[in-house]
């Protein structure tokens, strides 16, 4: 830490009225680009309009102006998020069975969408229990609302209106901070101040206020709900907040107020700030008192973290100093120069944030089922499957986005003349070693992981089960994973003396939590089948990384095209007369990386779906006998490719294929339609541009003959545009197919 003299007097950090508000400008499509604003000559115009509308780098090279546009766009994004949230809460208030579900969450399914009978589609309104007919939802909103203490639909209406007000406020803020008071570049680059405000404000005070809400509103209301009190009889949130005696009846230590806090007698608060671990046996969710404790602790950490960085007072950390001091014996200049990169290239900044947020999203996916946070979430199998799948897909897309923006940074913002012997330069200089080694790892993993399956298929086909890799023949137990499970299962009262239960039931220990005769969670056994599929995960993830990293490291130059940086982020080929140089741009690596990301995530969600149905989810009889949905067939069936096709894809597709005539029939139609969208993508991916240009010219000839030719000249999509349309339909078609397959299955059997 360095102590310096304080900064001079307050600096002016905004420009007043920098850009006039002009509806004429906004009404002219492509007003941000001189070329596009001229209007269309050919049909390529509409594609360029979409490609460049948000590419602020192409509108101007002024970093301050780009920063302001990004900042303003963020407010627009927040406005859309508030609008979406408002819609969710409004549906909960207007079209849902939330109050009925709250009264009996184990027998009534959540529904917040009722289909209007226009052409007979009211068949989609299935009976979700309690006499309510509607579409069963799997978003987890009901469970979240119960956890936050919402007991009636009026509260949902109020929240929906509040979200609309905030949406309007965000729209106004986006306009105000671009047209009326736009921050100067220095404000965007003041990282210490930004860290302090984001850490202490957003994360610190945000967590603290949520902890406060949980203690004063959620805990007492959930205590009543768990005890079976009718939601209409429970006092309203403001009564708990304003009347301490009400809370003191539930938690006697409340009567003492803040005295134990200031006298350091904190154990008095252990009634409602607990450290139990495990799940609440009534709801199958984490103990809400544990969650409140967690948010309070997190708030303290972030409030402290938000006071660590040096701003107007000459005390605290400076990010530049930290980065420049960060060098090891083998890393040359280390992180010197990174500060300049991250404060002048928003692509570099965004790349790191996307990589971290993507990884975090995938971690969230795993925690949502292993430590289900909300009441009655664990026994709502459709919602569990949806939340896992959703967070896995989102994480995958964010990580590919990280590679995309890293490559854009390399092409547009990287200055090789100022970088020497820092970490980035060193990585670039031995990129051949990195990529060739990574390639070797991919080949090794691919042949060995797939080879184990092929061996098993062959032995199975030849009728030699004793020679297969399985839990009953040649065992390949995941010993390291089992060791980690055991250390966590044994930790309470030994290495974690304060904890009474393990962090998650999945670690082991023999406990089972069932709610309303359904399994919420139990110890998840890992065996040979998991060992095999985990190596497929390793393989697909490493190939995705190989493609994306190669795209980044070779985005400026390669032996094939030494001057690649001059060609930009996306280009089809290195000009005429240079055969074999197509599809080498950084954009093309992102394009290919998306397909492998899709492979990776597909295997993960298939593994999860089958494993949970086979070994976790199911019913519990009065005698305590567990019957799993697929009867534990994962361990023996998933060890062959044939088993995956026969016992997972085909066997579990029966619900979606046979859904016609039932309330699940929309999933049958989506399954069909999404397959079509996916197949449509192949038309773009498997044919060349010239084919379409020739076809178009024939069609234009026919139009000319009939004198109906348009003024805008039709053109085939460029190579890059065609690939973009192809990958979009491939991914959307594939994801929607999986969605329909999963939901029809799990709603029917779960």
Swiss-Prot record:
Chlorophyll a binds at residues 683, 691. GO terms for cellular component: chloroplast thylakoid membrane; photosystem I. It is found in: Plastid, Chloroplast thylakoid membrane. It is a multi-pass membrane protein. [4Fe-4S] cluster binds at residues 573, 582. It comes from Cucumis sativus (Cucumber). It catalyses: reduced [plastocyanin] + hnu + oxidized [2Fe-2S]-[ferredoxin] = oxidized [plastocyanin] + reduced [2Fe-2S]-[ferredoxin]. It comes from the Eukaryota. P700 is a chlorophyll a/chlorophyll a' dimer, A0 is one or more chlorophyll a, A1 is one or both phylloquinones and FX is a shared 4Fe-4S iron-sulfur center. This is Photosystem I P700 chlorophyll a apoprotein A1. The keyword Oxidoreductase applies. The PsaA/B heterodimer binds the P700 chlorophyll special pair and subsequent electron acceptors. PSI consists of a core antenna complex that captures photons, and an electron transfer chain that converts photonic excitation into a charge separation. The eukaryotic PSI reaction center is composed of at least 11 subunits. Its EC number is 1.97.1.12. Keywords: 4Fe-4S, Chlorophyll, Chloroplast, Chromophore, Electron transport, Iron, Iron-sulfur, Magnesium, Membrane, Metal-binding, Oxidoreductase, Photosynthesis, Photosystem I, Plastid, Thylakoid, Transmembrane, Transmembrane helix, Transport. Chlorophyll a' binds at residue 675. PsaA and PsaB bind P700, the primary electron donor of photosystem I (PSI), as well as the electron acceptors A0, A1 and FX. PSI is a plastocyanin-ferredoxin oxidoreductase, converting photonic excitation into a charge separation, which transfers an electron from the donor P700 chlorophyll pair to the spectroscopically characterized acceptors A0, A1, FX, FA and FB in turn. Oxidized P700 is reduced on the lumenal side of the thylakoid membrane by plastocyanin. The keyword Chloroplast applies. GO terms for molecular function: 4 iron, 4 sulfur cluster binding; chlorophyll binding; electron transfer activity; magnesium ion binding; oxidoreductase activity. Phylloquinone binds at residue 692. The chain crosses the membrane at residues 70-93, 156-179, 195-219, 291-309, 346-369, 385-411, 433-455, 531-549, 589-610, 664-686, 724-744.
